[in-house]
Amino acid sequence: MKTSGSQSTLKDRLLLVVAGIVIAFTGAAGAEVDVSQSPLFVGSNVPGNLALVPSVEFPTVISVANLGGFTTGSRYVGYFNSAKCYKYNYDADETKRYFYPVASPAPDASFRCNDATLWSGNFLNWAATQTIDPFRSAMTGGYRVVDTPTTTILEKAVGERVNTGNFPRRTVTGSTVIAGVMASKWNKVMIRIDGLQNKMWITQDLDLGGNTNATGPRYEYNPSVHALDGSCLERTGRQCDRYDTDAVFELSVRVKVCDNAAGLEDNCVKYSQGYKPEGLIQEYSQRIKY
């Protein structure tokens, strides 16, 4: 009797469950409503919300952005404009040293400036850009170290570790190639970024060192003094004690952008007193809350 009663009770429960399911589906079908498959908004004037959780730690911040050797005619990404030539502004105050674009001449079709006083923006992108720099440029317009109403200067990311695996030392050979992209007449240039914070070292013949010290003397590059053409740096009487090919030169990797006199970059936006570089965050700031 117990077994029969238990089976009867179980059947009754199953019937109730099935009946409930049928009723639920029947009711749902009778009250069917079209629901938008697009994201729902409170109103047309209310911006959406976006949470950004980027992974931009080691080694992304300090790794090299433009891989491989330098190839004339290839375009490289970075804070510099590949379609512009630059001069270097030297000042006794290191924070006031930077590259700035010139209105003329413009690079040729292979991004070469071919001028003993000019640097190719495309070459500087290849030489000095860390992976985080294009990311910052795309998101915010770049890392501003000078940000006044009329002047904007961007600075490369900090290269804090001595590690050639993340940012290899670079070498470019050939006086013709170098003369087209640097303010130099050397026949070879070796470049170091790793461990130098916001700076770059260049030399023709010296070892760039395994830590923060090179194997030879280091000079703060001043274009009005240093021609980078094999000329003499130090003399004793008529005797030249050191040529510029046997020295290391230090440059600060900063660049002036959105200079209307030299031509604006594509991401420059007009403000009341000048132009500023913007990225996706500024572009969509009126439509999205971050």
Place the predicted regions along the sequence by residue.
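N-terminal secretory signal peptides that target proteins for export/translocation
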Residues: 1-11
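Short N-terminal leader segment in a subset of presequences, especially plant chloroplast
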Residues: 9-13, 40-41
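Bacterial N-terminal signal peptides
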Residues: 15-25
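Extended N-terminal export/anchoring regions of large proteins
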Residues: 28-290
